[in-house]
Amino acid sequence: MAIRPLNDRVIVKRHEQESKSAGGIVLTGSAAEKSTRGEVIAVGNGRTLDNGEVKAVDVKIGDIVIFNDGYGVKTEKLDGEEVLILSENDILAVVE
């Protein structure tokens, strides 16, 4: 299934993160902290400014990003995999 985000929305596939406790025990499931890094798999056209111009999204497909995983981030299933739909404002950095 294809997905096309609207406006300044970005679709991100979260990178899995193996977490270990201070004692070296591997944490899984709800005990493990979710990664806030992922790969951009789709981007919207951009945000419409007050003057009517469209400001393109600053990230592109394939970018690895660090994002804010809080209020406003929507989780969906796409072809059996979990993806995140978030606003460009929720992206904090691009990993280079």
Swiss-Prot record:
Annotated S-S bridges: none
GO-annotated biological processes: chaperone cofactor-dependent protein refolding
PROSITE patterns recorded: CHAPERONINS_CPN10 (PS00681)
Compartment(s) where it occurs, according to its Swiss-Prot or TrEMBL record: Cytoplasm
Superkingdom in the source lineage: Bacteria
Major location (coarse): cytoplasm
InterPro entries the UniProt entry points to: Chaperonin_GroES, Chaperonin_GroES_sf, Chaprnonin_Cpn10_CS, GroES-like_sf
Keyword Cytoplasm attributed: yes
GO MF entry, a single one: ATP binding
Gene Ontology CC annotation, any one: cytoplasm
Record's keyword terms, sorted: Chaperone, Cytoplasm
Family matches, as Pfam families: Cpn10
Protein task: Together with the chaperonin GroEL, plays an essential role in assisting protein folding. The GroEL-GroES system forms a nano-cage that allows encapsulation of the non-native substrate proteins and provides a physical environment optimized to promote and accelerate protein folding. GroES binds to the apical surface of the GroEL ring, thereby capping the opening of the GroEL channel.
Family note: Belongs to the GroES chaperonin family.
Assembly description: Heptamer of 7 subunits arranged in a ring. Interacts with the chaperonin GroEL.
Name of the molecule in the record: Co-chaperonin GroES
Source organism of this protein record: Pseudoalteromonas atlantica (strain T6c / ATCC BAA-1087)
